[in-house]
Amino acid sequence: MFQGASALTLDAKGRMSVPSRYREALQGQAEGRVTVTKHPDGCLLLFPRPEWEVFRAKIAALPMDAHWWRRIFLGNAMDVDLDSAGRILVSPELRMAAGLEKEVMLLGMGSHFELWDSQTYNAKEQAAMAQGMPDALKNFTF
């Protein structure tokens, strides 16, 4: 299970160092193999390969009227491996799609991660908080 936020920096080649607290889990669960794809909210999704296969099967089974969503998720997916330094390479196409330049936020979302441009994430988080809690959380006890 992946959780927590990590402020990270992409190097000049577009590589991101995966926080050490996740590396062992990714090595054990997926032999260091991850799949990166677009998310319609403007970030990237990073899945350990076994979790990607579950997600991929769900997307592939969507009805024909969702064919563009299959293209977005599956057509943009790229398989990458952690290198010996614990880094993954985010392709130029995916970096451009998510507006990633240098400063990024990696969010553990349970079975997978979201990778955001730091400024974009902060702006979207502030906007969400300004709107107040959605009805689904109004009866939730913190």
Curated annotation (Swiss-Prot):
Residues 5-51, 77-120 form the SpoVT-AbrB domain. One of its GO terms (biological process) is negative regulation of DNA-templated transcription initiation. It comes from the Bacteria. The keyword Translocase does not apply. It is found in: Cytoplasm, Nucleoid. GO terms for cellular component: cytoplasm; nucleoid. InterPro entries: MraZ (IPR003444), MraZ_C (IPR035644), MraZ_dom (IPR020603), MraZ_N (IPR035642), MraZ_sf (IPR038619), SpoVT-AbrB_dom (IPR007159), SpoVT-AbrB_sf (IPR037914). GO terms for molecular function: DNA-binding transcription factor activity; transcription cis-regulatory region binding. Its main location: cytoplasm. Keywords: Cytoplasm, DNA-binding, Repeat, Transcription, Transcription regulation. Forms oligomers. Belongs to the MraZ family. This is Transcriptional regulator MraZ. It comes from Burkholderia cenocepacia (strain HI2424). The gene is mraZ.
